[in-house]
């Protein structure tokens, strides 16, 4: 069939460019190591440096207990969307908790839960582009960092607003774009922590531009909530920001160890999202038990255990940074210094990055090789992520294995 032939040709092109994505099946809970399927063999235990469970909470007994108790109390499914009959007291409690956490940074804060971070980001950008009832967003411009997450990019596309992409964290370029913009409604959109580079957005400077040019500042804090700021409150706390024009998106599938997301903003902006956010209105609400689990995670994050886990993670980051700097200098890779759990090593081309990841897996270590279109062409990388669940020995084992893989690759290149 011609349609299948077209698909086959497209898949062949993906293979030729070393860009095929594959799924791996895990047979055990998310932790520092997991039993993972091995092509052509039996599943085996592999030490992971590729997940987003930054505090090691995904399999925490307190979270599992909270989810179980929530299911016994509220059942499994929500049964409907939030605006029909699916909004549980468990959702309401979680929203109140998130609003309280961000209240020092967003005056008159309210919150709204979403099923995923992707849905939250798409909703906020597309709905806020229509603020004031402009449909489509004919008098709105979205200003988006070049390295923003795909969900923010898709939200801008869905909004049908004008979109201006500014070079990564280039404040001068953004200022020039804002100065030249005649739109009544302006949205500055950014990751808080950039997911592939690990750097933190210059939010104080971005907020100053938002104030100067009367724009909203939308911050996706997927990788900051639980890790950055006082008591893990996130990137707004990290910088000590406060403004009515801030819209904060925190996701629960990373440091919080669960699933879902929450938007925190001025109560009027949240009410607007209830009226206009399509990914909130037209989908079944997250199971209430999940909200119970996330609330338990927030308890841990705010307490002594959360502080201890953040301190352990910070120690791992410092230890790994020393190794990464040394290895990058030796093998000609690009080390991207990051104060976060995301620790990229840019290799360059796709094939060498894949080969290094494969060599690590042969040693029982799993690291993701990230390639275009997720990252720009020529910047394929090993996206190494650290967790409080790791041990110091785990960090040393990764360093030894990567050094051996780099040496082998370097020797092969010299012999060719």
From Swiss-Prot:
Pathway: Cofactor biosynthesis; biotin biosynthesis. It catalyses: 6-carboxyhexanoyl-[ACP] + L-alanine + H(+) = (8S)-8-amino-7-oxononanoate + holo-[ACP] + CO2. Pfam families: Aminotran_1_2. Coiled coil: none annotated. Keywords: Biotin biosynthesis, Pyridoxal phosphate, Transferase. PANTHER family: 8-AMINO-7-OXONONANOATE SYNTHASE, CLASS II AMINOTRANSFERASE/8-AMINO-7-OXONONANOATE SYNTHASE. Catalyzes the decarboxylative condensation of pimeloyl-[acyl-carrier protein] and L-alanine to produce 8-amino-7-oxononanoate (AON), [acyl-carrier protein], and carbon dioxide. Homodimer. This is 8-amino-7-oxononanoate synthase. The lineage of its organism: Bacteria, Pseudomonadati, Pseudomonadota, Betaproteobacteria, Burkholderiales. The gene is bioF.
